Structure formats: C-alpha cells, structure tokens
A protein has these predicted regions:
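Signature aromatic-anchored transmembrane alpha helix within multi-pass, membrane-resident enzymes
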Residues: 2, 6-11, 172, 216-224, ...
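Perimembrane helix-loop-helix junctions
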Residues: 3, 158-163, 187-221
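Short helix- or helix-capping micro-motifs
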Residues: 13, 119-130, 134, 154, ...
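Short acidic/glycine- and proline-prone juxtamembrane loop motifs at membrane-interface regions
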Residues: 28, 131, 137-144, 317
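Hydrophobic, aromatic-rich transmembrane alpha-helices
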Residues: 103-104, 202, 264-295, 299, ...
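Membrane-interface transmembrane helices that cradle and orient dolichyl/undecaprenyl
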Residues: 111-116, 152-167, 201, 290-292
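Membrane-lumen/periplasm interface segments of specific transmembrane helices
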Residues: 178, 197, 210-286, 363-373
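Membrane-embedded, lumen/periplasm-facing catalytic core of multi-pass transferases
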Residues: 355-415
Length: 480
C-alpha cells in the first residue's frame, strides 16, 4: 500500500511537472551553452567549441561563465538533440525524468531514518513543490545534479557492512555528481573526512581500520579513473571557475543574508511564507543539533556547500541550494519530533498529529499551486517565450541568412546568439568595444541589461546602419 502511494505521488508529480513545461525558455543564457556543448559532442567539434567559448568570454565586457560547463549534462542532452534538434520542450524531458529518480532516491534515504508514513509525507513536500516543479522548465543541470547528489548521500550513509560493489557505486555516484557540476566533488571530501575520524575512533580495531582504508581507496580509485576518462574525452574549461574567487571575504559578507533568505523560496515568495520559513528554520537548527552525531555527512556537506557558494561572486537564487533542501527539510522534521518528545507524554499523540497536519497542509497547498500553474500553462498552449519567440527567431534568421558566416555579432545574450546562429558573438556595455563586431543587436525591452539601450546608442557616435527592426529588437550593421 505504501509503495502504491509513493508510485501515485511520483506519477502525479510527473504529470504536473510535464504540464508545466513550455515551448520556450527564460532569457538567461547558461542553458544555451549546455546545448552548444551537446551539439559539439554530436559533431565531434568540442575543441572548436572551446575556441568559440574563449572568444566570447575574452572579448566581452565581463565574464560570462566558465569556458565549458562539466560535460555530464550536455552528454545527457546530446541524444535528445540528435533526435529532436532545437526543441526546448524535448530538451527539458531529461530533467523531468531525473526529478522522478530524485524522488525515489529521497524516499529510500528517508526510509532508513523515519517511519514510512513520515518518509512518504516528506517526499510529498518535494513531489508537489511549486519552486522545483516550475524549475523543470529550465534546461539546466541542477535537477540531474540533485538526483546524483541524493543518490550519493544514499549510498554514502547506508548502514551495515559494505561490499566492494557498494564502494564502487559510491565512487561512481560521486563522479557523476561532479560530472554534472564541479561542486559535486565536495561529497568526496565529506566522505573522506568522516571516514578519517571513524578510523581514528576505531584505530585499535584492525579489521575496522582495514575496511575503512580499503573502502576509501576503492571510492577514490573509481572516482579518479572516471575523472581521468572524462579529461581524456572532453576538453576542460572548469579552471575558469576558480578565477572568480578573488575577493572571498567581501563576497561572503554580501552573500550570507541572501543565502539565508533564499531557503524561504522553497515555500513561496510572499512575506507570509517567509515568516513560516523562519519558524521552520528554528526546527532545522534544533534537528541538526540533535542529530549531528548520527548524520555527520549531512552536516558536513551542508556546511561545506554553503561556504563554497557564499564565496562565489555570482548569486543564482534558489537553484544553488537545491541539493541542501532534502537535508534542510529532514532536519526540520526531526527538530519538530525532538520538541514533541520533550512534552509531557499525554501530549505526544496530539503533538504528532499537529506535525503531520502541518506537513500535509503544506503538501496540499503545494499541489494546488502547482496544479493551477500547470493548468494555466496548458491553457496557454505551452507558450513560446524568451529567446524562442517569433521576434527573436526573425533576428536569428536575418543573421544566418543575410550576413557573412564569420561576421561577429554584439548581443546582450551572446551564448544564445551562438546557439541559434553559430556566429561568433560578444557582449558589450562599452561604445568602443562594440567596434569589435560587424553587427549590433539591441533589445528594446531590457534596458541596460548587458547592453547599451537603443535610446542611448546614438551617444556612442558609431557608424551604424539599421537593417532590421521589430517589436523587440533593432539590428544594426557596423560600418567600417
């Protein structure tokens, strides 16, 4: 019966999530680079991609991102692109499937720690969560990363005697987590730190010491072999991440409040949800304190993840804390149970009922909100938005059909332009830098967002010849 409930929840989550997917995409252009990397895998042009990426990054006004994202997610997109081409809807399907996989892993992770009814309840919170289900409309690596990080935690924290195959599984799971996002390597660090202290605590037990050493060595060996294979198959561009950690202290000082508050978006955007989050946060602290000895890997991963991200200069909103949300909600529930256990015994049943009622209500509200969003999307015929709308397509077609193949385009989202036209593209917020291009495309809707607005471009005194204009864009040829 309980497994049937889990299956029903996951099925409902898949239906609602699939109904939330649109035929367009938001204007952020990280997604474009994942798709371009996937295309380069299929065409065998990964080295040419790296050259193109270096040009876009080096010639633009500011840093746009790493030269290449980890190749795991582009590898997942490649077969979809091979079959469906540039179809945003199809390219979102891997995220949907990996989200279902995450829910299964999360249930198994909780089943070892909570009564089955609580495991199902906590999974329901995630299965119907509006933030996460709406995020499935993004072509980004965060959801596959969430799956692999949760799978890694599941394997790393499994109780009982571990076989060689189990350690191989841990090493592979951690590798695939890092293959999605470099920060997945924190899981390997967490495992080794916890195993080191376990070794110290059992140093007089030769059998346990040998088990720890052999197990840790196996995990590291599997990870290293897979990582070397990755380096041999794909060019590396991740080192450009580290150049962004320049002013750690100032970055952290500004980011700490942002990362504290961003957890509230798991519940909702309104002030009422934020106040509810503050209450849940107290229970989270209580649960983390009470279970620190039982869950050292959870605690260590949470702390290291926060440290790494508060020192990273680019705040990306809730998606950067997705891997921590299962730990956060788990500890919050444990904090509530800890408080109930301290009440007089006659209040235990009513206290437990209150906790269950609270989470059931939250799950119900989440399901209603997500269902309404999905229904509105279907009523809108899965609207085509952002860089895939007709006005944008008109610009891409002009660039592809009416300009020389190697002409340089200046555009506020250069990686999108590269994806759609294969033209070398840069971003410029300076008049002089615009001269590096052959064509200038300005958005009429975004103001000073990584561009000089159309209404201010005349002040640059550039030799511009307008060649196309529609409701969203104006295109200029830059004269010699």
């Amino acid at each position: 019966m309980r497994n049937a409930l889990l299956s029903i929840m996951i099925l409902v989550s898949l239906i609602v999530g699939a109904s939330t997917l649109t035929r367009g995409h938001e204007w952020g252009d990280d997604f474009a680079w994942y798709i371009v990397q996937a295309k380069s895998i299929l065409s065998g042009t990964t080295d040419e991609f790296m050259e193109q990426s270096a040009f876009t990054n080096q010639e633009s006004t500011t840093h746009l991102g790493p030269l290449a994202y980890p190749w795991g997610y582009p590898l997942l997109l490649a077969p979809v692109y091979a079959v469906k081409g540039m179809s945003p809807l199809a390219l979102k399907l891997p995220g949907l499937l990996f989200y279902a996989g995450f829910l299964v892993c999360f249930y198994l992770l909780m089943r070892d720690r909570l009564p089955q009814i609580e495991s199902l309840l906590i999974v329901a919170i995630f299965a119907f969560n509006p933030l996460l289900l709406q995020f499935l409309d993004q072509i980004l690596s965060d959801v596959p990363f969430l799956f692999f990080s949760t799978l890694s935690l599941l394997l790393m924290t499994r109780a009982g005697k571990r076989s060689l195959l189990h350690y191989i599984g841990i090493g592979a799971a951690i590798f695939f987590t890092a293959f999605m996002r470099v920060t997945g390597i924190l899981l390997l660090g967490c495992l080794l730190i916890v195993e080191f202290f376990r070794l110290l605590a059992n140093r007089s037990d030769r059998g346990t010491v040998l088990e720890i050493v052999k197990g840790s060595a196996t995990v590291c060996f599997v990870f290293i072999v897979l990582w070397i294979t990755n380096l041999l198959l794909f060019p590396s561009g991740g080192e450009s991440y580290f150049s962004q950690y320049a002013e750690l202290i100032e970055t952290a000082r500004a980011a700490i409040p942002a990362y504290f508050n961003v957890f509230s978006y798991f519940f909702g955007n309104t002030q009422a949800w934020k106040y509810l989050y503050y209450l849940v946060f107290i229970f989270f602290l209580l649960g983390a304190w009470n279970h620190a000895k039982q869950e050292p890997i959870f605690i260590l991963f949470f702390v290291l993840w926060i440290i790494v991200h508060i020192t990273y200069p680019y705040f990306q909103g809730p998606r950067y804390i997705f891997p921590l949300l299962p730990i956060f909600i788990y500890f919050a529930l444990q904090g509530m149970k800890f408080l109930i256990a301290r009440l007089p015994e006659q209040y235990h049943p009513s206290g437990q009922a209150a906790v269950y009622g609270f989470w059931i209500l939250i799950a119900g509200v989440f399901l209603v909100q997500s269902s309404l969003t999905a229904y509105a999307n279907l009523q809108n015929n899965r609207g085509i938005n952002g860089p895939f709308d007709p006005y944008s397509t008109e610009v891409y077609n002009y660039i592809k059909e009416e300009t020389p193949p190697k002409s340089v385009v200046v555009f506020f989202k250069p990686r999108v332009m590269v994806m759609m036209t294969e033209h070398p593209t840069i971003m410029s917020m300076e008049c002089d830098r615009i001269r590096k291009g052959d064509y200038l495309v300005l958005s009429r809707k975004v103001g000073e967002n990584q561009q000089i607005p159309p209404e201010e471009i005349d002040a640059c005194n550039l030799p511009l010849d307008q060649v196309l204009k529609n409701n969203r864009f104006v295109v200029y040829q830059i004269q010699e």
